[in-house]
C-alpha cells in the first residue's frame, strides 16, 4: 500500500548551493598567495574543483522522477526497490536517506538527499510526518 508518492523535481537550491561552494573554493585558490613555480599546483587544484562542480551538478540533476514510499522503510525510486537502512536525518531544507537496494543489480547502497524544494509543500510536510512518526528505528538500523 502506498503511503506517500511524489514526482521529484531538480532542486534549484541545491544547484545554487553547489555553485556557491565550488565558486568560493575557486576564489580562495585564485586569491591565495602562491609562490613562484607553483602554477601547476594552482592549476591542478582549480581543475579538481571544476570537475567536482560538474560531478556535483550531475548528481543533483539525477535526483528527480517518481518516488513512492510503501511503508516506513521501503520505497521505490528510479524503477528500483530500496530499503531505508538508518534513521532518516530530517532538517528544515531536506532529508537524508540511507538506502540499500533489495534487488541484485547496480549499486547496493546509496544516500539520497531529498531537498524540500524538489516537491510541493504538502508533499514535503506529509513525508516529514511519516518519517518522524516511525518509532521503531532500532539503534539507527532496521532489521
Curated annotation (Swiss-Prot):
Keywords tagged on the record: Antibiotic biosynthesis, Cell inner membrane, Cell membrane, Membrane, Transmembrane, Transmembrane helix
Keyword Cytoplasm among record annotations: no
GO cellular component: plasma membrane
Mutant phenotype after disruption: No effect on aerobic growth on succinate or in LB. 90% decreased synthesis of prodigiosin antibiotic, decreased transcription of flavoprotein desaturase PigA.
Subunit structure: Interacts with itself, SdhE and as in E.coli FtsZ and MreB; other interactions are shown but require validation.
Protein name per the record: Inner membrane protein YgfX
Compartments, record wording: Cell inner membrane
Organism in which the protein naturally occurs: Serratia sp. (strain ATCC 39006)
Domain remark in the UniProt entry: The intact transmembrane domain is required for Pig production, its replacement with 2 TMs from an E.coli membrane protein (MalF) does not allow Pig synthesis; although the chimeric protein is found in the membrane it does not self-associate.
